Regions:
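Conserved N-terminal alpha-helix of the aminotransferase class I/II PLP-enzyme fold
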Residues: 2-49, 71-78
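Conserved PLP-enzyme active-site core in the AAT-like
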Residues: 37-198
Length: 198
């Protein structure tokens, strides 16, 4: 009998689904961030696109900070809109712009805690308060701050993404990314999605 037919949920049966080294990385980065769970990806942009596309559907609205890494802008402007997600960009440092942009169909707010490359700072707690009052999810790219300098989960983020290639790996010689959040989100929403989309 093939092992994958009888494997339990925590057994390793296929490299893309996980392995002991990746599981240890996920456990440790979740502990650093203060998140319930984590899911490692092949790159930081896989983490960003996986987090957003696993949460959003056609007809949803996203509010995003304008100051973003170029590839993040591409995902928001070109990929999500192609599938019927509407995106509104705001000055991430202006709380009133966030407030004005949120609508009844707003499903998520996305920003970098420290913007790449402008280094603008977004008030995670204040934006999270607005989002949660509207029933929206807060997705924070915390790559420049790292879990050491900015615990985004503790400040109200629901989902946190990292490029492990940069400051987490420390030298840029290996690619990686990670998505962190609640155990329910990671295991019931993100993990099945990422297992089948890469």
């Amino acid at each position: 009998e093939a092992r994958f037919l009888s494997a339990g949920p925590d057994e390793f049966i296929y490299a893309r689904y996980g392995n002991p080294t990746v599981a240890m990385f996920e456990e440790r980065i979740a502990a650093l961030e203060g998140a319930e769970d984590a899911f490692a990806t092949a790159s930081g942009m896989a983490a960003v696109s996986g987090a957003l596309t696993s949460l959003l559907r056609a007809g949803d609205h996203v509010v995003a900070a304008r100051a973003l890494f170029g590839s993040c802008l591409y995902v928001l402007e070109e990929v999500l809109t192609r599938f019927g997600v509407e995106v509104t960009f705001v000055d991430g440092t202006d709380l009133e712009q966030w407030r004005a942009a949120i609508r009844p169909d707003t499903r998520a707010l996305f920003f970098e805690s420290v913007a790449n490359p402008t280094l603008e700072l977004v008030d995670i707690a204040a934006v999270a308060e607005l989002a949660h009052a509207a029933g929206a999810v807060v997705v924070v790219d915390n790559v420049f701050a790292t879990p050491v300098y900015s615990g985004a989960i503790a400040q109200g983020a629901d989902v946190v993404v990292y490029s492990a290639t940069k400051h987490i790996a420390g030298q840029g010689r290996c690619l990686g990314g990670v998505v962190l959040g609640s155990r329910d989100y990671i295991r019931k929403v993100l993990e099945p999605y990422m297992k089948h989309t890469g």
